[in-house]
Amino acid sequence: MALEYDWSGDTEVDTATLRAFIAATIGGDQHPDGTIFLSGMYVTARAVTGNDVNPAIALFGWEERFSATFRFANQASQKTTEHNIALMAHMLIAFAQRYGGNGVLLYNGDEAVLQYGEDGVTFSSDWEDWSENDEVAPLLTQFANTALPQPLL
């Protein structure tokens, strides 16, 4: 089973801008279909409207306007996977700082592991993968690190 993180946010951003930002920030290669590839990971991202909006995201207190899925190759080395997870975390921080709004990163679609909004970026203190990742752990001293609400669990 592949490792997967889902990111949703309420920022008004079009699909092309979202994909370009992700690709530039993580150093990925965007293919003609919009999928962003990086060794050991690929990302799909799009603005959502109407029936494409995930109503469950409203449990976080805002309406989903875009979504992205980060899928990690299960055949990649642990070092590659950890580096890609760090790139993902840095990209979310950069997006929050540049575009603002609210967002949440879910592990396998239901466990909130990172959130951002008016109060800044917050890492889930219950998610040990953050502190065990040498590239992410330093971020835990720069940003809030506390238990996050888990309305989907």
Residue spans of the language-model regions?
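Well-ordered, non-membrane alpha-helical segments in soluble/globular domains
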Residues: 82-93
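Residues in well-ordered beta-strands of folded domains
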Residues: 8, 71, 106
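Short, intrinsically disordered low-complexity segments
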Residues: 28-82, 98, 116
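Acidic, proline/glycine-rich low-complexity IDRs
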Residues: 94-153
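Short, extreme N-terminal segment that most often corresponds to the first beta-strand
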Residues: 1-37, 148-153
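Non-membrane alpha-helical secondary structure
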Residues: 10, 14, 84, 128-135
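Conserved short hydrophobic interaction patches
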Residues: 21-25, 91-98
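Generic "edge-of-domain/loop-turn" microfeature
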Residues: 12-14, 43, 112
